[in-house]
Amino acid sequence: MPDPLALAISTGEPAGIGPDITIGALLQLAGQNGHARYHVLGDAHLLASRAAALGVAHAWERRIAEGEVVIHHVPLAVACEPGRLDARNGPYVLSMLDAAIAGCRTHAGAPARFAAMVTAPVQKSTINDAGVPFTGHTEYLAEAAGVPRVVMMLAGPQPAHANAMLRVALATTHLPLRAVADAVTVPLLLETLSIIDADLRRWFGIARPRILVTGLNPHAGESGHMGREEINVIEPALAQARDAGIDARGPYPADTLFQPRHLRDADCVLAMYHDQGLAPLKYGTFGHGVNITLGLPFIRTSVDHGTALDLAGSGQAEHGSMIEAIRSAVTMAGHANGRHASARVPH
């Protein structure tokens, strides 16, 4: 039997629901992933206190004693109360991320300690208030890994096909809408499609990914009458991608692309901007979606929601998205280690 896959889980903003959903997810997953061991990064006292507040202290202690959950103590700067932010704990959040990143990297030929990392939500404002410029997990991980570009992809079960996944990647992420058209260029789309194609093969075991690409304008530009980005940028980028062996199709009108009959044979949809792609995905999958960063040299998954400060310590936080993030990380690591068969028959 192979050694258990070691997953790093950073517990996120200590005043938010990160500790709650980590504890809840790992208790619900008890015994379900016998080939995984969960390395939880965070303040051990905070986690024990939060488990007690949730009424699951004994179950949490048992998971640790059984060895399926391993606590890596990262000390808080100051004591934390659920729901109350403290900028002094901003560096604590980054310390957890740094430990997870270090564990996912190979060193001097030695294998990585962790097969993947899963991140609970962080409060960007707290980190910035601590004097550390921080725009988000994705950008921080890309800089730490030394890669020029990463791609945000969210995934969740297709509402009309319970056994099929809807994956939506973004050409641009956190940009004002007025800046999107200028940001969408042929080189950007080519690089984005290359990353998607490579990581769907590497992490998901898909032999020949099929990528459907949205237009930028209403009705995909209506043959140039509602904008020419489709003609001047997107179509040339898709042609070059196909010449490079990438199965990229489109551009399709975004308002009709997200239908079961179009998505049935798609491995991923590439949307041009944030709300164009994530609004339909979250409508159908919110609370069970997974945020996946493509283009990194290691696997990173996360939840599809924020810190929910008002729910911290209350026992009311849903941990479904954290469960799916953990399961996705296990599956992706399994593909990377050759422990799973290909997810689909080649086209």
UniProtKB/Swiss-Prot annotation:
EC number: 1.1.1.262
Catalytic activity: 4-(phosphooxy)-L-threonine + NAD(+) = 3-amino-2-oxopropyl phosphate + CO2 + NADH
Alphabetized SUPFAM superfamilies for the sequence: Isocitrate/Isopropylmalate dehydrogenase-like
UniProt keyword list: Cobalt, Cytoplasm, Magnesium, Metal-binding, NAD, NADP, Oxidoreductase, Pyridoxine biosynthesis, Zinc
Pathway membership, UniProt: Cofactor biosynthesis; pyridoxine 5'-phosphate biosynthesis; pyridoxine 5'-phosphate from D-erythrose 4-phosphate: step 4/5
Cofactor binding note: Binds 1 divalent metal cation per subunit. Can use ions such as Zn(2+), Mg(2+) or Co(2+).
Example of a GO MF term: zinc ion binding
Cysteine disulfide links: none
Residue runs in coiled coils: none
Entry GO CC: cytoplasm
Residues that hold a divalent metal cation according to the record: 174, 219, 274
Cofactor names: Zn(2+); Mg(2+); Co(2+)
EC class (word): oxidoreductase
Protein family: Belongs to the PdxA family.
Protein name in UniProt: 4-hydroxythreonine-4-phosphate dehydrogenase
Name of the gene encoding the protein in the UniProt record: pdxA
